[in-house]
Regions:
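Sec-dependent bacterial lipoprotein signal peptides
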Residues: 1-17
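Acidic, polar-rich low-complexity tracts and alpha-helical solenoid repeat scaffolds
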Residues: 16-265
Length: 265
């Protein structure tokens, strides 16, 4: 029985391969599309792509152009060829402005870019591009079918960008004692982070380290400059205490404030 099953599988594979080769060499566009549909159902995306890319140009200007173009873009996405799928979904969006699947294509442009986005520690240009495309989708389709997923992915990618930016500022802070102008660089980085990433969960981290950076900068200054620079640290503390009364850094921030006050006294 087992041998019969194996033989049947071999026969089906040979027949399938024969059908694919026949369609590949045929000039019949409809045969190519039917065979591609069978291959897509079997998750044989690479072979389906080979057939669809032959017929997409042939169907341009016909009623079947949009469905075939969408199949092609989807096949590229499923095959993990995200730069190409993103391009094809973008082409679809621009070419078929009244098509009911235009919303889906607009969403999938962002999804293709999302799949190319690296971990947060790497260059985040693909993440920024994906974020922009999802924002386009959200703006165009505020009640869209894919809105919930788009918002979820936006939150995920924004967190990556926030974490990347915060760690850059944190690295300036860690290197500050060992580099000329290190504390001013850390201060500028934390200030920029607070302004540029207003919804980030790292806001209180940045606000606390801003106090710490300014305090360290002040006490390492010439004596004539210390009071003025400590006043700035106090201002940072006041902002922190107002914005984050329950922060995990509250005790540490209070300790810094005591040091500032005792220094002034």
């Amino acid at each position: 029985m087992k041998q019969i099953t194996v033989l049947l599988l071999i026969v089906f594979a040979v027949v399938g391969c024969s059908n694919y080769q026949k369609a590949l060499k045929s000039s019949d566009a409809k045969l190519k599309v039917r065979t591609a549909d069978s291959l897509l159902a079997a998750e044989k995306y690479s072979k389906a792509i080979n057939l669809l890319e032959q017929v997409v140009p042939a169907y341009r200007g016909t009623d079947s152009a949009a469905p075939v173009a969408l199949k092609y873009a989807n096949a590229l996405y499923q095959d993990g060829r995200y730069p190409e799928s993103g391009y094809q979904f973008e082409t679809y969006r621009k070419s078929y402005v009244l098509d009911p699947n235009r919303e889906y294509a607009t969403f999938m442009i962002g999804k293709s870019l999302y799949e190319m986005a690296p971990i947060y520690s790497k260059d985040q240009e693909p993440t920024e591009k994906a974020l922009a495309k999802f924002q386009d989708y959200i703006n165009i389709y505020p009640n869209g079918e894919y809105l919930a997923e788009a918002n979820m992915l936006v939150d995920e990618m924004q967190f990556k960008l926030d974490k990347k930016a915060y760690e850059i500022a944190e690295n300036y802070f860690k290197r500050a004692p060992f580099s000329r102008g290190g504390y001013t660089a850390a201060i500028a980085s934390f200030e920029n982070f607070i302004v540029d990433h207003p919804g980030s969960e790292f806001q209180d981290d940045a606000a606390y380290h801003l106090i710490d950076s300014q305090y360290s900068y002040a006490i390492k200054s010439f004596s004539s400059l210390i009071p003025e620079r400590l006043e700035v640290a106090k201002e940072y503390y006041d902002t922190f205490a107002t914005r984050f009364p329950n922060s995990e850094y509250k005790e540490q921030a209070d300790d810094l404030m005591e040091k500032i006050n005792s220094y002034n006294n």
